[in-house]
Amino acid sequence: MIGIDIVSIARVERCVKRFKMKFLERFLSPSEILLCRDKSSTIAGFFALKEACSKALQVGIGKELSFLDMCISKSPKNAPLITLSKEKMNYFNIQSLSASISHDAGFAIAVVVVS
């Protein structure tokens, strides 16, 4: 399955400015927050990536999958990687996840392929 999501970077900037860490902690782990380094485009990309993953799994964010069930990291070449907890990998019967994030014209877009 494939999931895709697009997020306005300006909207993320407004949320960070208004809600500070409370906004980030709602959908990012401490290690993911460190990866973002307060960069709005990266935060928007990470949000889009988690939303795209939930769409690829056809469940959205809710009872079956929370933002914190997904973990974003970077490959040695700085490409985004997304993983799920072992429990969720088994629950959804996932063998692998592939991810891509791009930024342009004030938007962050992410795609996740689940196999």
Swiss-Prot record:
Enzyme class: transferase
Pfam families, per the entry: ACPS
GO molecular function: holo-[acyl-carrier-protein] synthase activity; magnesium ion binding
SUPFAM superfamilies linked to this entry: 4'-phosphopantetheinyl transferase
InterPro entries documented for this protein: 4-PPantetheinyl_Trfase_dom (IPR008278), 4-PPantetheinyl_Trfase_dom_sf (IPR037143), ACPS (IPR002582), Ppantetheine-prot_Trfase_dom (IPR004568)
The reaction(s) this protein catalyses: apo-[ACP] + CoA = holo-[ACP] + adenosine 3',5'-bisphosphate + H(+)
The enzyme's E.C. designation: 2.7.8.7
Biological-process GO terms, alphabetical: fatty acid biosynthetic process
Protein location: Cytoplasm
Cofactor requirement: Mg(2+)
Keyword vocabulary terms for this entry: Cytoplasm, Fatty acid biosynthesis, Fatty acid metabolism, Lipid biosynthesis, Lipid metabolism, Magnesium, Metal-binding, Transferase
Coiled coil: none
Record-listed Mg(2+) binding positions: D5, E51
Name of the protein in question: Holo-[acyl-carrier-protein] synthase
Organism: Helicobacter acinonychis (strain Sheeba)
Upper lineage: Bacteria, Pseudomonadati, Campylobacterota, Epsilonproteobacteria, Campylobacterales
